[in-house]
Amino acid sequence: AAAAFLPDERLLVALDVDGTILDIEGRMSERMMTSLVRLRARGARVVISTGRGIQAALPVAHRVGLTDGWMICANGAITLRMDPTAPGGYEVVDSVTFDPADAIAALSRAVPDGIVAVEVLGGGFKVSRPFPDGELIEAQRVVSLEEMASQPVTRVVLRAPGMDVNEFSELVAGCGLHSVEYAIGWTAWLDVAPAGVTKASALQALAARLGADAERAGHAGRAEHAEQTGHTGHTGHTGQTMHTIAVGDGANDIEMLRWAGIGAAMGSAPQSVKDSSDIVTEPVWHDGCAALLDAVVERTRKRDRS
């Protein structure tokens, strides 16, 4: 049924990582890897769009053979261009930071036993105490809350190991966070981003950048400058429509799913995420994302044969 929704034109496909292309154990199925390779071979732009920081996201991209192209990290606060010739294999092309002092103060008051952390652009995390083993892939350095609040950051994180996620959500809702974006995950984990910064805002800016690049290169017929036009795609300078598909499973994916021409929620997603999508695919443990991408590939094959 999903195939009926899929566009025929050239695509930008934004994919969440955890719970979408990776399962809860951090594993990627062979089918998922094969689907991504086939999709890229059909000319689609695949953009990893994740809450992970750079150092945690790059290995995922490399695992599926993405060593060039674009990636959205830190829930939209960082956009990077992967380039094998650049130092570290990437170049940060856009980043948004904010003063974390108010968020740190509010969160540490609301959940005194929680772990507070801030993400430093390209430099891992400063943490109030170490995270549980395996939860934070990037480097972490224990510092005081005062030091955390001393410079702009791309993200503030609050983690409360052992706390029920519903209790955690209530405490966060009542703590007085203002002028920021925030999303709560499957566990008692909170990401706080600069105001107005989401995966969707970063993808919108990226689509505009790609369109401008195409215009400068003289490829007007393939211009991909995106301006939000509802749920029918994103229209470039020349009137050409760039179709966009996004797949995700978390609260931090809701804006991205609404932004995309087709937003697909994983079957394992919370109901609020499903309600924000156009279609719902199978859960991650049944390769729901791969099934959707396979349908896209099959649709483009039929188009090319017609």
Specify the residue positions occupied by each region the protein language model found.
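Mg2+-dependent phosphoryl-transfer enzymes with acidic/Ser/Thr/Gly-rich catalytic loops
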Residues: 3-4, 8, 12, 29, ...
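Active-site phosphate-binding/coordination module
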Residues: 30-133
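Hydrophobic packing residues within well-ordered alpha-helices of enzyme cores
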Residues: 32, 57-61, 168, 172, ...
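Short active-site oxyanion
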Residues: 43-47, 67-69, 155, 242-243, ...
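Short, structured coil segments at secondary-structure junctions
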Residues: 64-67, 75, 176-178, 259-260, ...
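Short acidic-hydrophobic, aromatic-tinged amphipathic segments that line or gate anion-handling sites
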Residues: 94-96, 141-143, 280-284
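Conserved acidic, metal-coordinating active-site core of Asp-based
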Residues: 110-221, 233-247, 251-253
